[in-house]
Curated annotation (Swiss-Prot):
<feature type="binding site">
    <location>
        <position position="283"/>
    </location>
    <ligand>
        <name>S-adenosyl-L-methionine</name>
    </ligand>
</feature>
<comment type="similarity">
    <text>Belongs to the class I-like SAM-binding methyltransferase superfamily. RNA M5U methyltransferase family. RlmD subfamily.</text>
</comment>
<protein>
    <recommendedName>
        <fullName>23S rRNA (uracil(1939)-C(5))-methyltransferase RlmD</fullName>
        <ecNumber>2.1.1.190</ecNumber>
    </recommendedName>
</protein>
<feature type="binding site">
    <location>
        <position position="92"/>
    </location>
    <ligand>
        <name>[4Fe-4S] cluster</name>
    </ligand>
</feature>
<dbReference type="GO" id="GO:0005506">
    <property type="term" value="F:iron ion binding"/>
</dbReference>
<dbReference type="GO" id="GO:0051539">
    <property type="term" value="F:4 iron, 4 sulfur cluster binding"/>
</dbReference>
<feature type="binding site">
    <location>
        <position position="171"/>
    </location>
    <ligand>
        <name>[4Fe-4S] cluster</name>
    </ligand>
</feature>
<dbReference type="InterPro" id="IPR012340">
    <property type="entry name" value="NA-bd_OB-fold"/>
</dbReference>
<dbReference type="InterPro" id="IPR029063">
    <property type="entry name" value="SAM-dependent_MTases_sf"/>
</dbReference>
<feature type="binding site">
    <location>
        <position position="317"/>
    </location>
    <ligand>
        <name>S-adenosyl-L-methionine</name>
    </ligand>
</feature>
<keyword id="KW-0408">Iron</keyword>
<keyword id="KW-0411">Iron-sulfur</keyword>
<keyword id="KW-0489">Methyltransferase</keyword>
<feature type="binding site">
    <location>
        <position position="333"/>
    </location>
    <ligand>
        <name>S-adenosyl-L-methionine</name>
    </ligand>
</feature>
<keyword id="KW-0949">S-adenosyl-L-methionine</keyword>
<feature type="binding site">
    <location>
        <position position="89"/>
    </location>
    <ligand>
        <name>[4Fe-4S] cluster</name>
    </ligand>
</feature>
<keyword id="KW-0698">rRNA processing</keyword>
Amino acid sequence: MAQFFKAKPNSSKQLSAKLSLNVDQLDHLGAGIAQYQGKVVFIPGALPDETVTVQLTEQKKNYARAKLIKVDAQSPERVEPECPHYHTCGGCDLQHMSLSGQREHKEAALLDIMAKFAGTEGGALSPALTGEGWHYRRRARLATLFDKNTKHLSLGFRAASSSNVVPISQCQVLAKPLSDLIVPFAKLLNQLSAKASLGHLELIAADNGHFAVLRITKALNDKDLAKLSAFAEQHQIYICLQDNEGQFQGVGVELVLPVYQLLDENAQSDAVSLSFTPGNFVQVNSQINKAMVAQAMDWLAPAPDERILDLFCGMGNFSLPLAKMGADVIGVEGVAEMVSQARVNAKANNLDKLTFYHGDLSADLSLEPWMGKIDKLLLDPARAGAFESLQWLKKMKPRKVLYVSCNPASLARDSAVLLERGYRLQRLGLIDMFPQTHHIEAMALFELTK
Protein backbone atom coordinates (compact mmCIF):
# COMPACT_ATOMS: atom_id res chain seq x y z
CA MET A 1 0.00 0.00 0.00
CA ALA A 2 1.34 3.37 -0.94
CA GLN A 3 1.81 5.81 1.94
CA PHE A 4 1.62 9.51 1.30
CA PHE A 5 3.58 12.07 3.26
CA LYS A 6 1.46 14.78 4.87
CA ALA A 7 3.36 17.86 5.93
CA LYS A 8 2.77 18.92 9.52
CA PRO A 9 2.28 22.57 10.38
CA ASN A 10 5.51 24.26 11.35
CA SER A 11 4.85 24.75 15.07
CA SER A 12 7.96 26.88 15.56
CA LYS A 13 6.70 29.35 12.95
CA GLN A 14 3.24 29.36 14.55
CA LEU A 15 4.73 30.13 17.96
CA SER A 16 6.98 32.90 16.65
CA ALA A 17 4.24 34.63 14.63
CA LYS A 18 2.56 37.73 16.08
CA LEU A 19 -1.24 37.75 16.08
CA SER A 20 -3.92 40.37 16.63
CA LEU A 21 -6.72 39.03 18.84
CA ASN A 22 -9.89 40.37 20.46
CA VAL A 23 -10.25 39.51 24.15
CA ASP A 24 -13.73 38.36 25.21
CA GLN A 25 -13.45 37.72 28.94
CA LEU A 26 -11.18 36.73 31.82
CA ASP A 27 -10.71 33.19 33.06
CA HIS A 28 -10.91 32.39 36.77
CA LEU A 29 -7.15 32.93 37.09
CA GLY A 30 -7.35 36.46 35.67
CA ALA A 31 -5.97 35.74 32.18
CA GLY A 32 -7.64 37.19 29.10
CA ILE A 33 -9.50 34.76 26.83
CA ALA A 34 -9.55 35.10 23.03
CA GLN A 35 -10.36 32.78 20.11
CA TYR A 36 -7.94 31.71 17.37
CA GLN A 37 -8.52 29.01 14.75
CA GLY A 38 -11.22 27.37 16.86
CA LYS A 39 -9.09 27.34 20.00
CA VAL A 40 -9.31 29.21 23.26
CA VAL A 41 -6.21 31.34 23.81
CA PHE A 42 -5.21 32.38 27.34
CA ILE A 43 -3.39 35.73 27.54
CA PRO A 44 -2.10 36.87 30.97
CA GLY A 45 -2.25 40.65 31.27
CA ALA A 46 -5.04 41.16 28.72
CA LEU A 47 -8.49 42.48 29.65
CA PRO A 48 -11.98 41.99 28.17
CA ASP A 49 -12.90 44.24 25.22
CA GLU A 50 -9.27 44.81 24.30
CA THR A 51 -7.56 44.22 20.96
CA VAL A 52 -4.07 42.92 21.61
CA THR A 53 -0.98 41.81 19.75
CA VAL A 54 0.29 38.50 21.14
CA GLN A 55 2.80 35.77 20.47
CA LEU A 56 1.79 32.15 21.01
CA THR A 57 3.94 30.38 23.61
CA GLU A 58 2.16 27.03 23.78
CA GLN A 59 -0.15 25.10 21.44
CA LYS A 60 -2.37 22.24 22.62
CA LYS A 61 -5.20 20.39 20.90
CA ASN A 62 -8.01 22.51 22.36
CA TYR A 63 -6.28 25.61 23.67
CA ALA A 64 -3.20 27.79 23.40
CA ARG A 65 -1.29 30.21 25.59
CA ALA A 66 0.13 33.51 24.45
CA LYS A 67 2.38 36.31 25.63
CA LEU A 68 0.99 39.83 25.53
CA ILE A 69 3.16 41.98 23.25
CA LYS A 70 1.07 45.16 22.92
CA VAL A 71 -2.38 46.50 23.79
CA ASP A 72 -3.76 48.04 20.60
CA ALA A 73 -7.19 49.05 21.95
CA GLN A 74 -7.48 49.45 25.71
CA SER A 75 -10.29 48.49 28.06
CA PRO A 76 -11.64 51.36 30.20
CA GLU A 77 -10.77 49.13 33.18
CA ARG A 78 -7.04 49.17 32.37
CA VAL A 79 -4.89 51.18 34.80
CA GLU A 80 -1.17 51.74 35.23
CA PRO A 81 0.26 49.28 37.82
CA GLU A 82 1.51 51.08 40.93
CA CYS A 83 4.35 48.67 41.66
CA PRO A 84 7.64 49.10 39.75
CA HIS A 85 8.24 45.33 40.05
CA TYR A 86 4.81 44.28 38.78
CA HIS A 87 5.87 42.84 35.43
CA THR A 88 8.66 40.68 36.89
CA CYS A 89 7.52 39.82 40.42
CA GLY A 90 5.12 36.88 40.72
CA GLY A 91 3.20 38.24 43.71
CA CYS A 92 0.38 40.20 42.00
CA ASP A 93 -1.33 39.53 38.67
CA LEU A 94 -4.19 42.04 38.39
CA GLN A 95 -2.61 45.43 39.11
CA HIS A 96 -3.32 46.39 35.49
CA MET A 97 -7.08 46.31 36.22
CA SER A 98 -9.10 48.82 38.24
CA LEU A 99 -10.05 47.71 41.75
CA SER A 100 -13.77 47.91 40.92
CA GLY A 101 -13.15 45.87 37.78
CA GLN A 102 -11.26 43.24 39.76
CA ARG A 103 -14.13 42.85 42.21
CA GLU A 104 -16.74 42.71 39.47
CA HIS A 105 -14.72 39.97 37.75
CA LYS A 106 -14.31 37.99 40.98
CA GLU A 107 -18.03 38.11 41.76
CA ALA A 108 -18.89 36.99 38.23
CA ALA A 109 -16.32 34.17 38.43
CA LEU A 110 -17.72 33.03 41.79
CA LEU A 111 -21.28 32.91 40.45
CA ASP A 112 -20.12 31.14 37.29
CA ILE A 113 -18.23 28.40 39.16
CA MET A 114 -21.10 27.84 41.60
CA ALA A 115 -23.62 27.64 38.74
CA LYS A 116 -21.52 25.19 36.72
CA PHE A 117 -20.56 22.78 39.47
CA ALA A 118 -23.16 23.27 42.20
CA GLY A 119 -26.22 24.16 40.12
CA THR A 120 -26.88 27.37 42.04
CA GLU A 121 -27.53 29.64 39.05
CA GLY A 122 -29.80 32.63 39.38
CA GLY A 123 -28.88 33.53 42.96
CA ALA A 124 -27.90 37.00 44.11
CA LEU A 125 -24.70 37.69 45.98
CA SER A 126 -24.55 39.36 49.37
CA PRO A 127 -22.50 42.57 49.42
CA ALA A 128 -18.79 41.79 49.04
CA LEU A 129 -16.40 42.25 51.94
CA THR A 130 -13.91 44.79 50.62
CA GLY A 131 -11.20 47.00 52.07
CA GLU A 132 -8.04 48.84 51.13
CA GLY A 133 -6.57 47.93 47.76
CA TRP A 134 -2.97 48.69 48.73
CA HIS A 135 -0.69 48.00 51.70
CA TYR A 136 -3.19 45.55 53.18
CA ARG A 137 -0.90 42.57 53.82
CA ARG A 138 0.28 42.34 57.41
CA ARG A 139 2.49 39.35 56.66
CA ALA A 140 4.76 38.26 53.80
CA ARG A 141 7.53 35.74 53.22
CA LEU A 142 10.47 37.03 51.19
CA ALA A 143 12.75 34.57 49.42
CA THR A 144 16.54 34.80 49.42
CA LEU A 145 18.99 33.71 46.73
CA PHE A 146 22.76 33.67 47.22
CA ASP A 147 24.92 34.08 44.12
CA LYS A 148 28.14 32.10 44.62
CA ASN A 149 29.94 34.10 41.93
CA THR A 150 29.13 37.63 43.08
CA LYS A 151 28.69 36.66 46.77
CA HIS A 152 25.53 38.77 46.77
CA LEU A 153 22.28 37.80 48.48
CA SER A 154 19.06 38.83 46.71
CA LEU A 155 15.89 39.44 48.72
CA GLY A 156 12.47 39.50 47.08
CA PHE A 157 9.62 37.40 45.72
CA ARG A 158 9.79 34.59 43.20
CA ALA A 159 8.91 35.28 39.59
CA ALA A 160 5.67 33.80 38.28
CA SER A 161 5.98 30.03 37.61
CA SER A 162 9.68 30.16 38.44
CA SER A 163 12.14 29.58 41.27
CA ASN A 164 14.05 32.74 40.32
CA VAL A 165 14.05 35.46 42.97
CA VAL A 166 13.14 38.97 41.81
CA PRO A 167 14.93 41.51 44.05
CA ILE A 168 12.49 44.19 45.17
CA SER A 169 12.85 47.56 46.86
CA GLN A 170 9.21 47.87 47.95
CA CYS A 171 5.88 46.04 47.94
CA GLN A 172 2.70 47.98 47.26
CA VAL A 173 0.41 45.41 48.89
CA LEU A 174 2.54 44.89 52.01
CA ALA A 175 1.87 47.06 55.09
CA LYS A 176 3.89 50.26 54.60
CA PRO A 177 6.12 49.82 57.69
CA LEU A 178 7.07 46.34 56.45
CA SER A 179 7.61 47.49 52.87
CA ASP A 180 9.95 50.19 54.15
CA LEU A 181 12.08 47.49 55.84
CA ILE A 182 12.84 45.52 52.65
CA VAL A 183 15.84 47.59 51.50
CA PRO A 184 17.37 47.93 55.01
CA PHE A 185 16.99 44.18 55.55
CA ALA A 186 18.59 43.37 52.19
CA LYS A 187 21.56 45.55 53.14
CA LEU A 188 21.80 43.97 56.60
CA LEU A 189 21.66 40.37 55.39
CA ASN A 190 24.45 41.04 52.89
CA GLN A 191 26.65 42.19 55.79
CA LEU A 192 26.32 38.88 57.64
CA SER A 193 29.16 36.38 57.37
CA ALA A 194 26.56 33.57 57.20
CA LYS A 195 24.62 35.08 54.30
CA ALA A 196 25.12 31.93 52.22
CA SER A 197 23.26 29.96 54.91
CA LEU A 198 20.14 32.11 55.15
CA GLY A 199 16.69 31.01 54.06
CA HIS A 200 13.50 33.04 53.75
CA LEU A 201 12.66 36.18 55.71
CA GLU A 202 9.13 36.56 57.05
CA LEU A 203 7.85 40.03 57.97
CA ILE A 204 4.83 40.45 60.25
CA ALA A 205 2.90 43.54 61.37
CA ALA A 206 0.96 42.63 64.50
CA ASP A 207 -1.06 44.61 67.02
CA ASN A 208 1.81 44.31 69.52
CA GLY A 209 4.64 45.31 67.19
CA HIS A 210 6.55 44.39 64.06
CA PHE A 211 8.28 41.03 63.72
CA ALA A 212 10.85 39.41 61.45
CA VAL A 213 11.53 35.68 61.28
CA LEU A 214 14.81 34.72 59.63
CA ARG A 215 15.29 31.11 58.55
CA ILE A 216 18.85 29.86 59.14
CA THR A 217 20.48 26.58 58.14
CA LYS A 218 23.34 26.85 60.63
CA ALA A 219 23.96 28.75 63.88
CA LEU A 220 25.05 32.37 63.56
CA ASN A 221 28.23 33.65 65.19
CA ASP A 222 28.26 36.38 67.82
CA LYS A 223 29.14 39.14 65.34
CA ASP A 224 26.17 38.32 63.13
CA LEU A 225 23.87 38.12 66.15
CA ALA A 226 25.12 41.52 67.32
CA LYS A 227 24.35 43.06 63.91
CA LEU A 228 20.82 41.61 63.98
CA SER A 229 20.28 42.84 67.55
CA ALA A 230 21.44 46.37 66.69
CA PHE A 231 19.17 46.40 63.62
CA ALA A 232 16.20 45.26 65.74
CA GLU A 233 16.78 48.06 68.23
CA GLN A 234 17.27 50.70 65.53
CA HIS A 235 14.10 49.75 63.64
CA GLN A 236 11.98 48.81 66.68
CA ILE A 237 11.29 45.30 65.45
CA TYR A 238 11.38 41.86 67.09
CA ILE A 239 13.72 39.50 65.24
CA CYS A 240 13.70 35.77 65.81
CA LEU A 241 15.63 32.95 64.16
CA GLN A 242 14.15 29.66 62.98
CA ASP A 243 16.52 26.70 62.69
CA ASN A 244 16.32 23.47 60.70
CA GLU A 245 14.23 21.81 63.41
CA GLY A 246 11.67 24.61 63.32
CA GLN A 247 12.68 25.97 66.71
CA PHE A 248 12.51 29.73 67.31
CA GLN A 249 15.00 31.90 69.17
CA GLY A 250 14.62 35.59 69.94
CA VAL A 251 17.50 37.90 69.00
CA GLY A 252 18.54 40.20 71.83
CA VAL A 253 15.27 39.63 73.74
CA GLU A 254 13.08 36.77 74.88
CA LEU A 255 10.84 35.33 72.17
CA VAL A 256 7.62 37.36 71.85
CA LEU A 257 4.57 36.04 69.96
CA PRO A 258 2.66 38.28 67.54
CA VAL A 259 -0.94 39.09 68.54
CA TYR A 260 -3.87 39.96 66.25
CA GLN A 261 -7.25 41.29 67.34
CA LEU A 262 -10.24 39.35 65.96
CA LEU A 263 -13.12 41.34 67.45
CA ASP A 264 -12.77 44.94 68.58
CA GLU A 265 -13.83 45.97 72.05
CA ASN A 266 -17.30 47.51 72.23
CA ALA A 267 -19.98 48.36 74.78
CA GLN A 268 -21.28 44.78 74.87
CA SER A 269 -18.05 42.82 74.77
CA ASP A 270 -14.32 42.89 75.40
CA ALA A 271 -11.92 42.44 72.51
CA VAL A 272 -10.97 38.96 71.34
CA SER A 273 -7.34 38.48 70.31
CA LEU A 274 -5.25 35.68 68.85
CA SER A 275 -1.54 35.06 69.34
CA PHE A 276 0.40 32.74 67.06
CA THR A 277 3.78 31.21 66.48
CA PRO A 278 5.58 32.56 63.40
CA GLY A 279 5.20 30.01 60.63
CA ASN A 280 1.61 29.11 61.51
CA PHE A 281 -1.21 30.14 59.19
CA VAL A 282 -3.12 33.33 59.92
CA GLN A 283 -5.12 35.54 57.58
CA VAL A 284 -2.84 38.23 56.16
CA ASN A 285 -5.47 40.94 55.65
CA SER A 286 -6.40 42.28 59.09
CA GLN A 287 -9.18 44.61 57.91
CA ILE A 288 -10.93 41.90 55.89
CA ASN A 289 -10.38 39.21 58.51
CA LYS A 290 -12.18 41.31 61.13
CA ALA A 291 -15.04 41.93 58.69
CA MET A 292 -15.11 38.23 57.80
CA VAL A 293 -15.29 37.14 61.44
CA ALA A 294 -18.02 39.70 62.15
CA GLN A 295 -20.03 38.52 59.12
CA ALA A 296 -19.61 34.88 60.16
CA MET A 297 -21.02 35.70 63.59
CA ASP A 298 -23.93 37.57 61.98
CA TRP A 299 -24.78 34.83 59.46
CA LEU A 300 -24.34 31.88 61.80
CA ALA A 301 -26.01 33.77 64.69
CA PRO A 302 -24.59 31.69 67.56
CA ALA A 303 -26.87 31.53 70.59
CA PRO A 304 -25.86 30.78 74.19
CA ASP A 305 -25.29 27.06 74.84
CA GLU A 306 -25.67 26.04 71.18
CA ARG A 307 -23.28 23.23 70.23
CA ILE A 308 -21.17 24.54 67.34
CA LEU A 309 -18.47 22.54 65.59
CA ASP A 310 -15.60 24.49 63.97
CA LEU A 311 -13.69 22.23 61.58
CA PHE A 312 -10.26 23.33 60.30
CA CYS A 313 -10.28 25.75 63.23
CA GLY A 314 -6.61 26.73 63.12
CA MET A 315 -5.67 28.70 66.22
CA GLY A 316 -9.23 29.87 66.89
CA ASN A 317 -9.96 32.57 64.29
CA PHE A 318 -13.69 31.72 64.46
CA SER A 319 -13.80 29.47 67.54
CA LEU A 320 -12.81 32.23 69.95
CA PRO A 321 -15.49 34.74 68.82
CA LEU A 322 -18.13 31.96 68.77
CA ALA A 323 -17.31 31.07 72.37
CA LYS A 324 -17.29 34.77 73.29
CA MET A 325 -20.94 34.88 72.17
CA GLY A 326 -21.84 32.07 74.57
CA ALA A 327 -21.85 29.01 72.34
CA ASP A 328 -20.35 25.66 73.36
CA VAL A 329 -17.63 25.36 70.75
CA ILE A 330 -15.69 22.33 69.56
CA GLY A 331 -12.69 23.14 67.39
CA VAL A 332 -10.88 20.50 65.34
CA GLU A 333 -7.61 21.09 63.49
CA GLY A 334 -5.16 18.85 61.63
CA VAL A 335 -1.96 20.63 62.75
CA ALA A 336 -1.08 19.69 66.34
CA GLU A 337 0.96 22.86 66.98
CA MET A 338 -1.99 25.05 66.01
CA VAL A 339 -4.29 23.10 68.35
CA SER A 340 -1.89 23.80 71.22
CA GLN A 341 -1.84 27.49 70.34
CA ALA A 342 -5.65 27.56 70.09
CA ARG A 343 -5.83 26.31 73.69
CA VAL A 344 -3.38 29.02 74.74
CA ASN A 345 -5.56 31.62 73.01
CA ALA A 346 -8.72 30.37 74.71
CA LYS A 347 -7.05 30.70 78.11
CA ALA A 348 -5.65 34.15 77.30
CA ASN A 349 -9.16 35.36 76.39
CA ASN A 350 -10.72 33.77 79.52
CA LEU A 351 -12.95 31.51 77.41
CA ASP A 352 -13.85 28.18 78.98
CA LYS A 353 -16.70 27.00 76.71
CA LEU A 354 -14.16 25.77 74.19
CA THR A 355 -12.69 22.33 73.54
CA PHE A 356 -10.02 21.77 70.91
CA TYR A 357 -9.06 18.48 69.29
CA HIS A 358 -6.29 17.42 66.94
CA GLY A 359 -7.44 15.15 64.13
CA ASP A 360 -7.14 14.20 60.47
CA LEU A 361 -10.31 15.60 58.91
CA SER A 362 -9.85 13.57 55.74
CA ALA A 363 -10.00 10.27 57.67
CA ASP A 364 -12.80 8.17 59.21
CA LEU A 365 -14.40 10.48 61.80
CA SER A 366 -17.04 8.07 63.10
CA LEU A 367 -15.20 7.23 66.34
CA GLU A 368 -13.92 10.72 67.13
CA PRO A 369 -14.96 11.83 70.65
CA TRP A 370 -16.47 15.04 69.32
CA MET A 371 -18.53 13.39 66.57
CA GLY A 372 -22.29 13.59 67.16
CA LYS A 373 -25.32 15.85 66.99
CA ILE A 374 -24.52 19.54 66.72
CA ASP A 375 -26.59 22.67 66.20
CA LYS A 376 -24.36 24.44 63.69
CA LEU A 377 -21.22 23.72 61.67
CA LEU A 378 -18.49 26.12 60.55
CA LEU A 379 -15.97 25.05 57.92
CA ASP A 380 -12.81 26.96 57.01
CA PRO A 381 -10.72 24.46 55.02
CA ALA A 382 -7.58 24.87 52.96
CA ARG A 383 -7.80 24.94 49.15
CA ALA A 384 -8.55 21.20 48.97
CA GLY A 385 -11.92 21.82 50.63
CA ALA A 386 -13.96 19.75 53.09
CA PHE A 387 -15.37 16.96 50.91
CA GLU A 388 -14.34 14.10 53.23
CA SER A 389 -15.62 15.85 56.36
CA LEU A 390 -19.02 16.45 54.76
CA GLN A 391 -19.56 12.70 54.37
CA TRP A 392 -20.43 12.67 58.10
CA LEU A 393 -23.28 15.19 57.90
CA LYS A 394 -25.85 12.52 58.83
CA LYS A 395 -24.18 12.01 62.20
CA MET A 396 -23.82 15.74 62.87
CA LYS A 397 -27.18 16.98 61.52
CA PRO A 398 -26.43 20.72 61.85
CA ARG A 399 -29.29 23.11 61.12
CA LYS A 400 -26.89 25.61 59.59
CA VAL A 401 -23.54 25.23 57.83
CA LEU A 402 -21.26 28.23 57.31
CA TYR A 403 -18.53 27.57 54.75
CA VAL A 404 -15.56 29.95 54.44
CA SER A 405 -13.64 29.14 51.27
CA CYS A 406 -10.30 30.12 49.74
CA ASN A 407 -11.01 28.12 46.57
CA PRO A 408 -14.33 28.56 44.73
CA ALA A 409 -13.80 25.28 42.83
CA SER A 410 -13.74 23.16 46.00
CA LEU A 411 -16.56 25.30 47.47
CA ALA A 412 -18.73 24.49 44.44
CA ARG A 413 -17.92 20.77 44.66
CA ASP A 414 -18.69 20.68 48.40
CA SER A 415 -21.83 22.78 47.93
CA ALA A 416 -23.18 20.04 45.66
CA VAL A 417 -22.79 17.58 48.56
CA LEU A 418 -24.70 19.88 50.91
CA LEU A 419 -27.49 20.42 48.39
CA GLU A 420 -27.83 16.65 47.90
CA ARG A 421 -28.14 16.20 51.68
CA GLY A 422 -31.11 18.53 51.96
CA TYR A 423 -29.43 21.87 52.55
CA ARG A 424 -30.28 25.07 50.74
CA LEU A 425 -27.88 27.87 49.88
CA GLN A 426 -29.18 30.91 51.75
CA ARG A 427 -26.35 33.40 51.31
CA LEU A 428 -23.21 33.70 49.21
CA GLY A 429 -20.71 36.53 49.14
CA LEU A 430 -17.25 37.44 47.90
CA ILE A 431 -14.44 38.06 50.38
CA ASP A 432 -11.81 40.21 48.64
CA MET A 433 -8.93 39.12 50.86
CA PHE A 434 -6.25 39.66 48.19
CA PRO A 435 -6.77 42.78 46.02
CA GLN A 436 -4.48 43.08 42.98
CA THR A 437 -4.49 39.28 42.58
CA HIS A 438 -6.91 36.82 40.97
CA HIS A 439 -7.48 34.95 44.26
CA ILE A 440 -11.14 34.56 45.22
CA GLU A 441 -12.39 33.85 48.74
CA ALA A 442 -16.04 33.44 49.61
CA MET A 443 -18.51 32.77 52.41
CA ALA A 444 -21.61 30.62 51.97
CA LEU A 445 -24.44 29.86 54.39
CA PHE A 446 -26.56 26.71 54.06
CA GLU A 447 -29.69 25.79 56.01
CA LEU A 448 -31.28 22.36 56.37
CA THR A 449 -34.68 22.19 54.67
CA LYS A 450 -35.52 18.47 54.83
